[in-house]
Amino acid sequence: MFKKTKPRISILALTISCAIYSGAALAQDAANSNKFWWPEQLNLSPLRQHGVESNPMGSTFNYAQAFKKLDLNAVKADIKALMTQSQDWWPADYGHYGPFFIRMAWHSAGTYRIYDGRGGAGGGQQRFEPLNSWPDNVNLDRARRLLWPIKQKYGSSISWADLMVLTGNVALESMGFKTFGFAGGRQDDWEADTVYWGPEKKWLDDKRYSGDRTLEKPLAAVQMGLIYVNPEGPNGVPDPLLAAKDIRDTFGRMAMNDEETVALIAGGHTFGKAHGAHKPETCLGKEPAAAGIEEQGLGWTNKCGKGNAEDTITSGLEGAWSVNPIAWTTQYLDNLFAFEWVQVRSPAGAVQWIPKDGQAANLVPDAHDKTKRHAPIMFTTDLALKEDPEYRKISLRFKENPKEFELAFAKAWFKLTHRDMGPRVRYLGNEVPGEILLWQDPVPEVDHPLIDAADITKLKSSLLSSGLSSAELVRTAWAAAASFRGTDLRGGANGARIRLAPQNTWAVNNPRELNRALTRLEKVQGDFNKASTGGKKVSLADVIVLGGVAAVEQAAKKAGYAVEVPFIPGRTDASQAQTDVTSFAVLEPTADGFRNYYAKDNTLPPTDMLVERANLLTLTVPEMTVLVGGLRVLGANSDAAKNGIFTDKPGTLSNDFFINLLDMSTQWRKSAKTGGLYEGLDRKTGKLKWTATPVDLIFGSHSELRAVAEVYAANDGQEKFVNDFVKAWHKVMMLDRFDW
């Protein structure tokens, strides 16, 4: 029996081998996507990512509760011990993994960008393609493998996303630096995020620039596969002043000002070294995503020398900045200004800089051989801190005031690693700093009794008799809540920032109407608070949302349905002093298909921008569909235009939008008068019935959206439409309620 089994195993192995290596077999199995055949077709896949189906923890797992039970001190002790437990398969530089883990944490968080809130440490996306295989992330696969025993030990109690950031903090602390704090609460993703990283088809290309080196929005890196800038200079041109421009642009797009930028670069380059022992094109294998299955998720296998230690290849630059690369010092800044720097090339051929005339040739110890010493190095981007006038002022101030430098780096590091976490209420753990920072978009805590059911009923009545139409109430509530971004958890109705700069001047919010509406809503709030007893109050933020609730309930009643739209009080009102105008400016929607708004300077079509807005609001395809249909009949267009209002009874929560959109008695054509608009004509008489935008018509044109629209247009679809709209409306109103 044993002899009979053996050849069968061999045959099975041969079969598997053929399946793996036969390109023809794979080609036969792989079907071309619809996008291949129809590249202009609207892509709805962003609205289907990160579903519960891909999450092995299931929908009932509560990460926050699991993290709260974690002994964070024990985790940190294990991480600290790991720092000096050098492994033969990946020896630690200078006997300490600290600098390696700082780079891992930095590159995990450093993908964040302000224009769409994508990137950042949340989700632990560094584990997935494309980030796990970016040229700028060479060898960080090893950093995560070094951490695996700790992740394995604590399991689901700490996410990869939190662990990578925490490890960066412990790395700093283990080398003598006092961090500003740490907050947990980052849940892991289980699949690669759908993110536009740039138009390039090759690594390190830079087709993202136009004109006089204008970087395409929302991108925040100079080349495909880099976190920020090219350390050798723009496109490898070793010009520190040109590099300074790239640094200021990219770090600014990551929400960092000049002082924070200098602190991060100078602080980060205090530690560790760059690796360029050999030419990567000669020595390195394929990146993790392209490596063989036997590599088990690792990549960049180095066939030169030992393949690690003194033969390590990462960026291609080679050397350390300071004399003691595993301790917090001011040596980076001291060296930067102490020497005149000249160009040389690393063993890998990369341009870098060393002190002129052989100065300090033996200043820096070797990372692995105690008998060797080297000159300190600088990147072109390091010299930018010396050559750029503003960066130079800050760098010299930090050099002369070490304590100020230390605090600046601590705060900038905390901001770097926590920028995408949203408000402080999401922060978990006993190391959350007590200081409230402006970039956290703070809102006051509730310091008064909240309104109850009787109060809510009374306020609804006051709102409906305030002189505002139901459409105005809906528009104001939507404008407040729909500023939310699920990417970095900013925006939303809480704080009532819609009454503050810059939101009160956004074109999409129709400032003149908004001012009128807010005046009426503030009167309702003021009258209630003046008449209330026992210290009970209602915030303007709650009044704004409640106005939308009252209007939706009234509209449903007109349609014949008595529904109660959920409402949970507890929002508070932020002040202008708590609102960074520049920081909030990037949240301004240049398109909002739910309000049929589309600014002329957009580069993407209105339908793509609708999907983008729905994605930022964390909506599904059905939720997007029902909200558009409902908001149209409620008259929620930003400028009160009639486009897409396919009903003869506006203000009634009917399914008329879908019924009339799918009505074959209407023939659609492009408007000859107004670009971007369509006219719906009676097929028999040619009489104009409706006008529409592409966002309206896509629900009848796109096969998947039409399938959903048909559900709501059916004879039995009205009640489902009302219930689904109410549920989706409530979801949007609550997106920023992390306190609930």
Swiss-Prot record:
Domain of life of the source: Bacteria
Q: Which residues form the active site?
A: 107
Please write the reaction equations for the catalytic activity of this protein. Answer: H2O2 + AH2 = A + 2 H2O; 2 H2O2 = O2 + 2 H2O
Required co-factor(s) are: heme b
> What GO terms are given for molecular function?
catalase activity; heme binding; metal ion binding
Which Gene3D superfamilies would you find in this protein's record? Answer: 1.10.520.10, Peroxidase, domain 2 (1.10.420.10)
Q: Which residues form a coiled coil?
A: none
Protein name according to UniProt: Catalase-peroxidase 2
